[in-house]
């Protein structure tokens, strides 16, 4: 399938009841990065660049729950002080394996023409995410990569900054993915783009917060057995009517691809 067309050539309604613009993407497909696109936590992976492939206990002891970004700023600073340069970190990011079936899924999505608009929301960092995606040949698929800003500083060392501030009590201080996705949808609506359906592929606890934006007809793809999946199950059990989106757990990305294929067949 090289394109995506409504039945009988009719234009479809978006999720807010507006008529979808001709040629506009019909579906927004959002991916997490760590343990979703790639099969590791990239923040753990870069520890391989440290002396002895281990961080000192004095550094690890500085972590505070909810302030992981601040902790990772210290990790990058420490690595830089040990002589680790961005090119060394890039090599590590480039070598992180994709999750099983992920390359096929991303290739499938890329072949669907205007069906999908694809974005990535990650609490990792832009340098690492982009290094990984470029090495895998999938960077151009993503219209926007929304992650903590990072890049070489004036000394040539990798520096990390928080993505934004927010008032969500459930999320880390540097990123609320609900706010990130909400702001993106608002921006696209201002551009005249109104999506028919939202699809969200993730794994972590911070991927649960944006589930509040999903409505009937939308689909959450939590990685089976991971925190996002467990939180969805708890929410469904506590108040079944509160979670309106369909839930399709995945073990390999082939599970996501097969479901999206069925969605396109029903269009």
From Swiss-Prot:
Coiled coil where? Answer: none
Q: Name one GO molecular function term.
A: phosphatase activity
Q: Which cofactor does it need?
A: Mg(2+)
The record's annotation in Gene3D superfamilies points to: HAD superfamily/HAD-like (3.40.50.1000)
Pfam family name, one: Put_Phosphatase
Q: Per the UniProt record, which EC number(s) apply here?
A: 3.1.3.75
GO annotation, biological process: bone mineralization; bone mineralization involved in bone maturation; endochondral ossification; regulation of bone mineralization
Give the protein's biological function: Phosphatase that has a high activity toward phosphoethanolamine (PEA) and phosphocholine (PCho). Involved in the generation of inorganic phosphate for bone mineralization. Acts in a non-redundant manner with PHOSPHO1 in skeletal mineralization: while PHOSPHO1 mediates the initiation of hydroxyapatite crystallization in the matrix vesicles (MVs), ALPL/TNAP catalyzes the spread of hydroxyapatite crystallization in the extracellular matrix.
Question: Its family?
Answer: Belongs to the HAD-like hydrolase superfamily. PHOSPHO family.
Which PANTHER family does this UniProt record tie to the protein? PHOSPHATASE, ORPHAN 1, 2, PHOSPHOETHANOLAMINE_PHOSPHOCHOLINE PHOSPHATASE
User: What is the name listed in the Swiss-Prot or TrEMBL entry for this protein?
Assistant: Phosphoethanolamine/phosphocholine phosphatase
Q: Which species?
A: Homo sapiens (Human)
- Source species taxonomy: Eukaryota, Metazoa, Chordata, Craniata, Vertebrata
Q: Which gene encodes it?
A: PHOSPHO1
